Amino acid sequence: MERYDKATLNAAFAPEFRQNEGSLTSTLRTLLFFTALMITLPVGLYFSSKAYIFEGTLGMSNRDSYFYAAIVAVVTVHVVLAMFVYVAWSEGTRQWREGKQD
């Protein structure tokens, strides 16, 4: 049996670990970006569309503006989710293709 020291083992597994670490960092960064979008964008668009578009520009009542602003927020959530699925799918197929070429 051969004995391996730590330097030899680290040199053997370092490129694979670095590739996985980069992939994990990229995935985490994407997830955090879309999490921030999912929290801020629908809430921000809800209040801004309610105040500036529906009540301010269109002159709707307070009750009607709640309803239409909620629709804007729900549509925004669906758009952000669709964007996340597209980016995750593209990133996954890119990583799969890179793995197949090795």
From Swiss-Prot:
Residues on Cytoplasmic side: 1-30, 88-102
Transmembrane segments: 31-51, 67-87
One Pfam assignment: VMA21
Alphabetically ordered keywords of this record: Cytoplasmic vesicle, Endoplasmic reticulum, Membrane, Transmembrane, Transmembrane helix
Disulfide bonds: none
One Gene Ontology term, aspect cellular component: lysosome
Cross-referenced InterPro entries: Vma21
Function: Required for the assembly of the V0 complex of the vacuolar ATPase (V-ATPase) in the endoplasmic reticulum.
Similarity comment: Belongs to the VMA21 family.
Protein name according to UniProt: Vacuolar ATPase assembly integral membrane protein VMA21
Organism encoding this protein: Gallus gallus
